[in-house]
Regions:
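Short beta-strand to alpha-helix junction loop
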Residues: 31-34, 67-70, 95-114
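Glycine-rich FAD pyrophosphate-binding loop
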Residues: 1-13
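A conserved short coil-to-beta-strand element within the FAD-binding core of flavoproteins
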Residues: 122-141
Length: 177
C-alpha cells in the first residue's frame, strides 16, 4: 500500500453495500451489489471468527428522501422484486429500502489485514510503486519509488480509481459505480 493499509479512502468509505440509486444504473451494478452483500455477510462472520475483529455487517436499510422519481423507482423495484416501504420523514413521505446492508469500513480493513497476515500473506505498507512499464499480463517483480525491487509470484492491485498512477494506459478508463 502507498500508505498504511485501510487508512485512506477505505477508511472514509460509508460502507453502504448497495448503489445509492440503483434505478439509474445498469442492472449489472445492482446484481453485483446484491451478491456482494451476501458475500460480506458470510465473510464478516469468517473474519470475526479468525481475527476477533467484528466488521459489524448490519442490514440497517436505506432511506430515500424527496425529491425522487417514484415511477422510475417502482418500475425498478417491480422488475427486481425489491421491497420498498413508505415512511414518514419530516412531515413528508420517504422511501425505505429495508434490505440494504452496511459494514464498518475501518473495522473491515483492520480485520482483513489481520486475516491476511494470519494466512501468511506479506503486506507491504508505506511503499509507492513505479508505473508498470511492460505490457505483460503477469509480472513477478515491481520497482518502488525508492528504487527497491519487490519480487513475488503474484501482485494484487487494489488501487481502484488510482490504478492509472501505476498503469497509465488505464487513465480515463476506470469509473466509480
Amino acid at each position: 500500500d502507498k500508505n498504511e493499509i485501510g487508512k485512506e479512502s477505505s477508511w472514509a468509505g460509508a460502507g453502504i453495500l448497495f448503489p445509492l440509486m440503483p434505478w439509474i444504473y445498469p442492472s449489472e451494478v445492482y446484481d453485483l451489489c446484491l451478491n456482494s452483500a451476501e458475500f460480506y455477510k458470510e465473510f464478516s462472520k469468517k473474519l470475526f471468527k479468525v481475527t476477533g475483529i467484528d466488521p459489524e455487517f448490519d442490514r440497517t436499510g436505506m432511506m430515500i428522501i424527496p425529491p425522487y422519481d417514484l415511477n422510475k423507482i417502482n418500475k425498478w423495484a417491480s422488475k427486481n422484486q425489491y421491497k420498498i416501504e413508505d415512511v414518514e420523514f419530516h412531515k413528508s413521505t420517504a422511501l425505505l429500502l429495508p434490505c440494504v446492508a452496511q459494514i464498518r469500513s475501518p473495522r473491515l480493513m483492520k480485520a482483513i489485514k489481520k486475516y491476511l497476515i494470519h494466512q501468511g500473506i506479506k503486506i507491504i505498507e508505506n511503499t509507492e510503486l513505479c508505473p508498470i512499464k511492460n505490457s505483460a499480463k503477469l509480472i513477478n517483480e515491481w520497482l518502488t519509488k525508492d528504487n527497491n525491487l519487490i519480487k513475488a509470484d503474484y501482485f494484487i492491485v487494489t488501487s481502484g480509481a488510482w490504478v492509472s498512477m501505476i498503469k497509465p494506459k488505464y487513465t480515463n478508463k476506470i469509473y466509480p459505480v
